[in-house]
Amino acid sequence: MSNVRNVFSQLTDPSLKAVIQDEAYRVLKRELAQTRHTNPFAQSPEAADALEALGINSHPYAITSHTHAAAKAIESDLYEVVSHYLPKENPVSFLFMKPAKLRFFHRGPTHGDHFLNAHVEPKDVPRYPQETIINRLADIPTQIAFMGDTLHFLSPSFLTALFAHSPRLQTLYATLVLPPEPSTSRSLYPQIYTLTYSEDGFMYIPGGHAGASYFHKYDQLEWLTVGHLTAPGCPTVTAQRLETKGANHLFIFQRGNYITPERRTFATNDQYVTVPHIFLPENYNCRTPISKTTMMQMFFYIKSGKEAQREGHLGQVQQLISTKELQHYQPSEITLLVNYFEFTATLDSHTCFEDVPPKLAPKTTPAPPLGISRILQFFRGRPSFVKLIKALDWQPITLEFPVRDVRTTVRGPPGFKNPFTQPQPVNPEDADISSRFQDFSRATNSTPKPTVEAVLEASAESPDHHTQLKVLCSALSEGQLEAIHALGHSRCGGPLLPELTAKSTPVEQCPDLPPCPTKSQASPASSNPSGPDAQPTAQNPETLPWVAWLPKLNALGFEALEVQHDPSTGEMIMPITDTQELPRATLPAHWQGHNLERILSTLRSLNRFPTPWSPDRTRARAFTSDVKNSRTGKALHRESQTWKETQTMLTENTQTELAISVIHGAGGSGKSQALQTLLRQDHSLPIEVVLPTNELRLDWLKKLPHNPPEQFRTFERAFVSSHSPVVIFDDYGKLPQGYLEAFALTHANLELVILTGDPRQSTHHESNEEALISKLPPATTIYSAFSRYYINATLRNSKFLANKLGVYSANSCPLNVTYGFQPLPGLHLLVPSLMKKAAFTDAGHKVSSYAGCQGITAPKVQILLDNDTTMCTKEVLYTALSRAVDSIHFVNTNAQSSAFWEKLEATPYLKTFLSLVREDKITEFQAPADAPKPVTPPVTHFPVEEPATTLDDFKEELRDKFDREIFTSDRGHTNCVQTDDPTTQLFSHQQAKDEALLWEMIRARLKISTPEANIEEFRAKKDLGDILWVNYHRAMGLPKEQPDFSEDLWNRCAEEVQNTYLKKTMAQLKGGERRQSPDFHEHQILIFLKSQWVKKMEKLGAKEIKPGQTIASFQQHAVMLYGTMARYMRRFRDALSPNNIMINCEKTPQDLSRWVLNYWDFSKPSYANDFTAFDQSQDGAMLQFEILKAKYFNLPEWVIEGYLDIKLSPKIFLGTLSIMRLTGEGPTFDANTECNIAYTHTRFDIPEGTAQIYAGDDCAIAQVCPEKPSFALLKNRIALQAKPAYTPQERGQWAEFCGYLITPKGLIKDPLKLHASLELAKAQKKAGVRDAITNVVANYSLDAKLAYSLGDDLQDLLSPHQAHLHQVTVRDLVKFGGSPFLNSD
């Protein structure tokens, strides 16, 4: 290795070093990819070192956490080892294994493997899919089987019975998890697992995490030493260990009597020893195994010191034993160990024997008799040296055991107790599911089919007879299977468990290409077109040549049920052409992960599965050479010379094979639609998009506005900056020749290339004739061989235009072709040369060249015909002609010259559009005359009305003050009716100082409960919350995939909440000082009575005063935290909500008016609604709905738990409140609004697209919708009580929303409400309130302006009474100085 290192150190060329590093990185990348597959978790340094000693690599940049990551890595690694033993062609039976783990064995659905599982423990119910459950292992259908981490819990007789009753089974591979060191009282791999002991067994705790631990009995350790298993009359089974890593072992059990090693060792690199028993009694000797290294260090220490001291020995032991290992020792053991060293330190290290070899003994020294020395030792005792040698006779812990034979008894086939044979306790939350299960079971009693229990009992294991392997699923209805599955899931964790899967999942074969459509397959009617002008004809789908492709065409948006013909040739146009079968690419193992598998699934659904591709180094070298010598490109040649030389050397020396998927199709065929949908749904996918032009990049950004901009790069920037394993090259034909190959060879991280383009359109043209790439064939020619089929259909162009180009079209709009002699202003102009492009651009036109217009789509384009047109290729002309949707304007400066007709003859497409005859004169295009300008009607005004009678009807029904006030015996009357003025008495004045009203508000609005009762209610109504959430999810059009949590958006929302709070005045901030204190408990709430004038029309002049509204003052930190939560979800809601649903949040009346004009339907009666006691009615069902909504947006768990805690335990001075909404919470408005939406859509069957508007407890719908039949079963459990209002939507009767009327001209303020409010201000002014008018005139004038600005249109909107109120109000506002606001823009 040193020689190789020396050679590398002598290399000085940076380009050569870059190539070597690139090659090393390619090897490293493959190894890291494999590591990510088997060990994707973040490991501690100690655990990573321990795994590496076992031959398992750890990913250095992994961030995925796991409670027992190291143990999981060993488990996955043993699966990887097993995969090399399993056959690649034949199926294998997997026992006690989840199908999801099949990826660790490098196997998939195509292998047809069998999964045989049983519900033994409760956690097995959600773990194993229902279709894999059996209740006896009687006949394994394959020769080879695998059992994962289960055999150590079973008896040896299970194994012999398994082989005895499965004659086809020859080999069983099994992994066991049994630590071999229980006798040593400590874990050999504390970084991976720990052990605890009891009298009858021990606990195995992977990663020290108690949640993953399980219990072993000591007799289960016998599995580590089993060699042969025999039973009377049964074949012998031979066991042999294949691999051991820590506590995980891989065994093979083979039918037959084979030789197996007589001993097995489980020793590690670290040697452990125990000290001999030198003290009496024996239990006062140290028994703890200690590292031999530590013992040797301690021995040298005690023998190298001058004098033995107990304190010194104890301190040295403390230094040698690390802090982490101290937990494995008892103080008594340490004390005994120190005594041992203290004793051995006193013993003499010098030999006491005088015997020496004869050659070394002096001749004059007589040899003492050996027998005499032994006799003297017997009487005098052993010398100190002999005692020392005996004390140093440490006993090693070898972990080596003899292999033994095991004899078992004869038993029936392995089986498992049926969990349905005895009743099980059901939680209250399971009531609905249990009810469904019982209903399904009862439903089958009236049919010949047996019930669930009967079927399971019939298939239960019997000791003397065995009939079947699996439960007969045909005896169970789909509903029963679903009920069983749901019942099991609900008992083991709820909605996070996997869903019920189908009985069988069809396996899609790749390349999955339907038969190539041929013209000979057409019916006689479709194969004989009537001529060039034949119109498309409807066809029976079964007779279409492309019937096998209809699902794919439908997915792209084509019905494809009619036959279309090329008008120039009369031939049928096929929507799918150029089909070919291609081999499938073999992708790295880590592609079985979730994100990368989604990409493959998308390509598989398109029949575009990747195929192998080896980049052409000749084309790559041509491109990098041109870049190096500045012969091409605008930006790459500005890179450093060293970088350019490195790229050139990489293309010369690198060889690689990648996966490529080529998507070819006509313009507007939806080539990129599925890819854009994939990127839109998941922004985190490791995909980059490379575009040939910045215009195309901006187009992608416009279609995917929420994706990060750096995901889309132009081709030169991508060549320098790209690092993704998957790259999409859109419109790749416009990339320089050789670019794709150079990109693939210089980017070692690239694994999958996706190309989208159209070989029939123009390709990149290199204007520099000196460039090497100018001599290369177009990329579309090369990569057409990698395209499985061509989509010869378009959604863009008119059928009459597309058919002339030989393309199938789904757009039936008529084609409009016009001619002229000069360009029309405002239309996109296409010209054949760059010179003409520059000239017309300078003249003020929007211009593109024929070749440069690729990617542009416009309803109408104009095409310039000149002498350069004849030099354009058919691909360039096709590109230009296919830009228009349904209208083309040809521009020719000399239409009658012979050159013009030569142009038509020289090009293959133009003649199909220009139906001209030489002798006929071309009809010149004449623009239609401008429409006459509308005459502005004369300005009129409403007639002057007498204001004195506007509120007389309300005043006449007024009762006396004390007849209206609320009376209580302990606090007397409330004080809401004030002054003697009848106008003022119409409005209830609620004041915070009114103690009688405060207590009446508490009695009516608040309900005292306990935390336990709140929890019980929350649990009891969870099912209702689930229903509300499902309806809300559907109504708001939320995607199925949950959006990832955005830390950046959360921080911005928190800043907005904080800034809003800091905008308060100093007095307001000081007023909230108490709840800002850290001593103010987060559950504590201060309750106040809201001071207000009640101006609701239904309470105007009310006969009885109603209780006031509450104001709740929460801890300020909690308000800001959950205000941030509400604002965060609001941002997502605003981005995802459908256009027909408007939420009046951060919107102006003008915004609402624009929305009404676009979406509201006034042709039907409308529905509006308010609620009775809306806040108090939001009980446990609404709380569950809020929790599910927060979880959907992936809010941090601590935020959700904190919000739930506050809602369940809110405390006021009277005690704990029940679950309800309180004004003053952070998310009050958003939560009210969303609960309103959820309730409305749960109650009503609202057609899709119906206009709806919501704000808190107010809502309005553009039509009256029928109530869902299911709501009759729910309404008695939902506390909300609606107050619906129906209006016919005609003059004077419009839907009301938040004090506004929704009219065909937009929103206007309710004239009665506005007039009444102004009358109150006038009465207050009269009563002596100096600023009563001044404070409101601006706001009231702006409210009135909504109607005032409509002018005479109000005559069509307002009833006579409303018009009267409007005129009086405007007249008063003008008197009070409101004219500037009424006439403002």
Swiss-Prot record:
SUPFAM superfamilies: DNA/RNA polymerases. The keyword Zinc does not apply. Residues 792-925 form the (+)RNA virus helicase C-terminal domain. Pfam families: RdRP_2 (PF00978), Viral_helicase1 (PF01443), Vmethyltransf (PF01660). ATP binds at G665, A666, G667, G668, S669, G670, K671, S672. Its EC number is 2.7.7.48, 3.6.4.13. Residues 518-540 have a biased composition (Polar residues). It catalyses: RNA(n) + a ribonucleoside 5'-triphosphate = RNA(n+1) + diphosphate; ATP + H2O = ADP + phosphate + H(+). Residues 1164-1271 form the RdRp catalytic domain. Keywords: ATP-binding, Helicase, Hydrolase, Multifunctional enzyme, Nucleotide-binding, Nucleotidyltransferase, RNA-directed RNA polymerase, Transferase, Viral RNA replication. Residues 635-791 form the (+)RNA virus helicase ATP-binding domain. One of its GO terms (molecular function) is ATP hydrolysis activity. InterPro entries: (+)RNA_virus_helicase_core_dom (IPR027351), Alphavirus-like_MT_dom (IPR002588), DNA/RNA_pol_sf (IPR043502), P-loop_NTPase (IPR027417), RNA-dep_RNA_pol_alsuvir (IPR001788), RNA-dir_pol_PSvirus (IPR007094). The keyword Transferase applies. Residues 504-540, 625-644 are annotated as: Disordered. Residues 59-224 form the Alphavirus-like MT domain. Belongs to the potexvirus/carlavirus RNA replication protein family. RNA replication. The central part of this protein possibly functions as an ATP-binding helicase. This is RNA replication protein. It comes from Plantago asiatica mosaic potexvirus.
